[in-house]
Amino acid sequence: MVEEKIEEAVDYGKVTGMVHSTESFGAVDGPGIRFIVFLQGCHMRCQYCHNPDTWEMEPNKSQLRTVDDVLQEALRYKGFWGNKGGITVSGGEALLQIDFLIALFTKAKELGIHCTLDTCALPFRNTPRYLKKFDKLMAVTDLVLLDIKEINEEQHKIVTSQTNKNILACAKYLSDIGKPVWIRHVLVPGLTDRDDDLIELGKFVKTLKNVDKFEILPYHTMGEFKWRELGIPYKLEGVKPPTADRVKNAKELMQTESYTEYMNRVHNS
């Protein structure tokens, strides 16, 4: 009861988050044109990460910003969003700052803004205490972009340094509550493109009842320079992006083209 009263008294506009950066005209992280907020902090160490500068939750690597401040910046671009665009929060791993997410999306929804969460879901916990906050977040979230790095747990540890148990649990939970989801898988030659694993991932996604879109994201090297700047060895040096044939193979094995519900949704922002 006391906790509920405290939550009710919070001025969401003054809630702060560690923001790494923003992008004004995102065109690939959700429907339409979107304002992207990249939050600081991530516990994964994906070998192909293009934002390794977002890993550490250190003040000197980010800006401490209020919800009102972020929204004020976002609203400058609202005229470009049309009826499909809105705000996407990514990272780093956005769920590490779930209180900021709840505050930002709550205020955004009051303004009629479409809210998308881009997450790998590693922080997810299927416990009553965590779900209380997660459900509160989902109540003001229109769409989740869920990154599934690898279906094979041992290979997932190699790719990210972490297990995928919480990620798959989150996928199932989102299915249970009927939250619209786009599944995303980064295709890295020799790392995340093994046929057997792709088939298993396709089977897993088929068990979910809420998948509007299933995206294959071909590996690219645009973030490699950041690893060099940070003095971190880049394990994928020399690895080329997947060929068109390998991308086509992955799409066919996982039947990604069968997920078309995203084309039927129109969002009013």
Task: Identify the residue ranges that each predicted region occupies.
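Auxiliary Fe-S-binding modules of radical SAM enzymes
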Residues: 1-28, 182, 187-269
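Solvent-exposed alpha-helices and their adjacent loops that cap or buttress functional pockets
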Residues: 12, 28-30, 81, 137
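Canonical Radical SAM [4Fe-4S] cluster-binding loop centered on the CxxxCxxC motif
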Residues: 14-15, 21-65
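Short, well-ordered coil loops that connect the C-terminus of an alpha-helix to the N-terminus
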Residues: 44, 48, 83, 162, ...
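Short glycine-enriched, charge-decorated loop/helix-capping segments at active-site entrances
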Residues: 53-61, 157-163, 231-240
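Extended, non-globular alpha-helical segments
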Residues: 59-77
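Conserved AdoMet/S-adenosylmethionine-binding subsite of the radical SAM
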Residues: 71-79, 83-86, 91, 95-222, ...
